[in-house]
Amino acid sequence: MGKAVIAIHGGAGAISRAQMSLQQELRYIEALSAIVETGQKMLEAGESALDVVTEAVRLLEECPLFNAGIGAVFTRDETHELDASVMDGNTLKAGAVADVSHLRNPVLAARLVMEQSPHVMMIGEGAENFAFAHGMERVSPEIFSTPLRYEQLLAAREEGATVLDHSGAPLDEKQKMGTVGAVALDLDGNLAAATSTGGMTNKLPGRVGDSPLVGAGCYANNASVAVSCTGTGEVFIRALAAYDIAALMDYGGLSLAEACERVVMEKLPALGGSGGLIAIDHEGNVALPFNTEGMYRAWGYAGDTPTTGIYREKGDTVATQ
């Protein structure tokens, strides 16, 4: 095992230079870079991968640019339903929450489920009451709302569409995927992953995608890899996308790059799925593959300058230390 490393994502989809101003680009790049730098400093200080991914996703939830926490999209009923998961590659313990509306940071609730309950996943009112009982504050769902998200809901209604993220266009492979996530490898060789989302604009209330499902949108195992996904949630669930990366490495003998190529570029498209993922293997190799036009992403080894990206760039999808 080499240097500690962190990678994060803020969603994948039809993200082209023609559609985004330089000012918009800079806002995303600055936000992603700052969060990775925080994670790098934590790793340098010897903090655990689990703490690093939890904090990175919490910060992504606090940033209204991304569809998780503050800035989450609206359901068809003009409500917010948030999902999150976290997994510790050292112990294989995991925690997740789904359909929560009164918790500012769902990833912290997922961490509570993992550490303070005998369960892996809790949903709705029960998950919220559990979090309140363990010290999390009850907040008004209004804190998640932004004018842009509401405009997108109205646009989606007009189109009669369900959309994944903040473009306001119909749900298809051309759209941005509204999920955030983080993966990390710490100085002790432990891996961890976390994923959080506000779901899909104009979705039916009660819909749950891959983000809170261990093995679909999030997975970590010290023996192989940590993965966080973003994309067409229903397809990622059917493909067990996050776990499939680990399985191909464990049982198929594939490298991280080969496993990611198989899942993201072959298996998911065959099922009609668009999106991407971030992954770090137990040796510290990093992969950030996506089959869409772009993916908000950033990564960096402890002590190095963060690398950020939005669009597809030649040679930037896999990095080795």
Which residue ranges define each predicted feature?
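Alpha/propeptide regions of enzymes that mature by internal proteolysis
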Residues: 1-321
